[in-house]
Amino acid sequence: RSPLLASSAASDVYKRQVFRQMTVTYIFGPTGTGKTRSVKEGCGYSNCYAVSDYHHPFDGYRGQKVMLFDEFHSSLPLNSMLQYLDGYPLELPCRYANKQACYTEAYIISNLPLEKQYVSEQHEKPEAWDALLRRINCVRVFDLDGSHKDYTVHEYFHPCTTPTFEQIEIDDCPF
């Protein structure tokens, strides 16, 4: 056997036995604000695989470190997404030959706010919805001007309103 084949086989065995520490970011905002471009440029185009055909999502995957679920609108079954966003060794389903998942970063990119994904599952399978939320490390919200703000899932769903204080005159104080 050639050294390349031997190292490839060893690599495949290694990948099937190693937990991948995953970072998952949910990105949403209006169209044309640079959501996808920001990820591809930030991570490097050659490091990214973008799912756009949700009937055969992984046929073109070649071991890239970054997975983009682009134009996502609850496009894959929730139980499948839970597997794709977890770090356990995973074979990705493909038409001709399954592929080993090697990515450690995943981005779900959409025009929809996070709470508009999997709406029926939020009520019918709340434990699965909660499992999805636990896998998401960051919610990135893009504005029309292309600027964005990052939140944890908790911060996103429970925005903290910082109290404001007013200066009052001593005569207005009841104490």
Please give the residue ranges for each predicted region.
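A generic structural signal for secondary-structure junctions
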Residues: 10, 43-44, 86
